[in-house]
UniProtKB/Swiss-Prot annotation:
Compartmental location: Mitochondrion
Keyword field contains Transferase: yes
PANTHER family for the chain: CITRATE SYNTHASE-LYSINE N-METHYLTRANSFERASE CSKMT, MITOCHONDRIAL (PTHR12176:SF83), SAM-DEPENDENT METHYLTRANSFERASE SUPERFAMILY PROTEIN (PTHR12176)
Organism this protein belongs to: Danio rerio
Record comment: activity regulation: Citrate synthase-lysine methyltransferase activity is inhibited by S-adenosylhomocysteine (AdoHcy) and oxaloacetate (OAA).
E.C. number(s) listed in UniProt: 2.1.1.-
MF term (GO), any: lysine N-methyltransferase activity
Top-level division of the source organism's lineage: Eukaryota
Recorded family membership: Belongs to the methyltransferase superfamily.
Chief location bin: mitochondrion
Name of the protein in its database record: Citrate synthase-lysine N-methyltransferase CSKMT, mitochondrial
An example Gene Ontology CC term for this record: mitochondrion
Keywords: Methyltransferase, Mitochondrion, S-adenosyl-L-methionine, Transferase, Transit peptide
Amino acid sequence: MLLNRFLVPLRSLQKLTQARRWHQTSLINDLVVNMDKKAMWDRFYTENGSKGQFKNFEWFFGFPSVKDLVLPALQAMSCSHSGPLHILDMGCGTSALGPCIYSTSPCAVRVTCADISPVAVKLMEEHTKSTSTQPCNPSSALVFLELDCTQMTGHFKSRSLDLILDKGTTDALVRSKEGQVKAGQILRQSLQVLRPSGSFLQFSDEDPDARLIWLEREVQGAEVTADVGVQEIGELRGVSYFCYQISPRSRPHS
C-alpha cells in the first residue's frame, strides 16, 4: 500500500530547519534533542497553534494511510466483544488519527486521545468541538486526556484496552538522549493494560532489523509476555514505514 500522505518522518526532522514553514529554527533544534521533555512539546504545540487557523499536525502520515489496516482490525475484534472497543491513541499530539477512527469506524469505539502536553489536548478539544465531529456509530465516544504515558497503569485498569496506537511516540523517545528508558516503560505498561485479545500497534520508519530486536528485548521479563510481528505499510520519498504489532501472551502455568 502506497502512503498517500507524507508529512514528517522523524529521521528527517533536522531538515525542517530549512523549510519555509518554520520560522523559529531554534524550536526544531531543541526538539531534536528534547523529544522526551513535556516542556518541549508544550512549546512546540503553543508555537504551532499560534500560526492562525488550526491544522492537524501528523508525524509520518495521516489516517488514510492506515485506514485499511486499522478499521478491519477493529471489525474483527468487535465480533467477539460486547460493548464499544476501547482504543488509546498514545501521544496523540494534534493528529487526526483518533478523531478519524471515531468518525469512520462502523463498530462502536471509545477513543481516548492522550498526550503529555495539555496544550495539544486543549487544541484538539477545541477543534473537534468547533467542527462538530460526529461518530460513525452512535454508541461511539471520543475523549481527550492529558496523560504521561509512562504512568499508564495509574490511569487505566489492567486488561481494559483493546487497541493502543503509537504513531511516532516511541520513535520520538528512542531518538532522544534520555527517552529509551521511558519507551521501554510505556511498552511494558501497554501490555499490562491491554486485554489478552488486544494489540499494540507501533507505526514507525525504523527498520525491522533494529526495532524487532529492541521490542523483543524489552518484553522479556515483563509481567505479561508478548508476541511481536511486523508488516510493511509502504514507501514514499525513499522512506519505508512499518507497523509493529505487539500482542499480549499469557505466561504458561508452572
